[in-house]
């Protein structure tokens, strides 16, 4: 019974950290300095039920997108369920979850750091390819694709910093506190 409570508390702690990270998206920040990549990597690493590993981080991202797009930014006149280009962002998010699920079986500083850097590159490549593929800003040739990636480079700083800082926070807090025994009556 005690082991079952510890497992439930651990699982609940993982979910709380993911939800907390998604809430931090509403705090003003430098461009692209967000927790979304870290949420995906963390969820993939610790939620060993494959269904939960994908559902919880993606649902958390989507709910925070609903709040941001409809109440904080309100770019659109109507209620926005999905924004243009969301498939590119969510696809990269799913790949990052898979990276966490497959490659972070043993958590170490090195493994988290390497997967964080790789994940930020994957996010950058996929989402900016999506910007180019939309056909609305760049010519639909190799030159347009190169210009798109070059224009996105200044934003990569925020992306990689966000991935590193939030991954350090999520993995660090969880690894530091996972063995703390809470007594309750």
Predicted feature residues:
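Hydrophobic core segments of transmembrane alpha-helices in multi-pass, intramembrane catalytic enzymes
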Residues: 36-40, 88-96, 166-167
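Structural signal for the C-terminal ends of transmembrane alpha-helices
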Residues: 23, 42-49, 95-107, 173-181
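Membrane-embedded alpha-helical hairpins and interfacial helices in multi-pass inner-membrane proteins
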Residues: 105-179
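Hydrophobic transmembrane alpha-helices
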Residues: 4-46, 51-56
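Hydrophobic alpha-helical transmembrane segments
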Residues: 11-16, 51-55, 87-91, 113-117, ...
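Short, charged juxtamembrane terminal tails flanking transmembrane helices
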Residues: 5-6, 178-185
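Aromatic-anchored segments of alpha-helical transmembrane domains
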Residues: 18-27, 58-71, 120-129
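Short helix-perturbing small/polar motifs within transmembrane alpha-helices
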Residues: 74-124
């Amino acid at each position: 019974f005690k082991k079952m409570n510890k497992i439930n508390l651990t699982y609940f702690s993982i979910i709380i950290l993911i939800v907390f990270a998604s809430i931090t998206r509403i705090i003003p920040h430098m461009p692209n300095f967000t927790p979304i990549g870290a949420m995906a990597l963390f969820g993939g690493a610790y939620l060993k039920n494959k269904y939960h590993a994908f559902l919880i981080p993606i649902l958390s991202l989507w709910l925070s997108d609903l709040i941001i797009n409809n109440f904080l930014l309100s770019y659109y006149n109507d209620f926005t369920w999905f924004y243009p280009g969301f498939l590119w962002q969510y696809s990269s998010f799913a790949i990052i979850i898979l990276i966490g699920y497959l490659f972070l079986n043993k958590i170490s500083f090195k493994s988290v750091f390497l997967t964080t850097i790789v994940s930020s590159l994957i996010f950058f490549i996929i989402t900016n390819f999506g910007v180019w593929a939309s056909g609305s800003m760049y010519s639909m040739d190799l030159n347009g694709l190169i210009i798109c990636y070059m224009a996105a480079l200044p934003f990569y700083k925020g992306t990689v910093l966000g991935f590193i800082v939030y991954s350090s926070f999520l993995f660090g807090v969880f690894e530091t506190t996972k063995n703390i025994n809470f007594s309750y009556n």
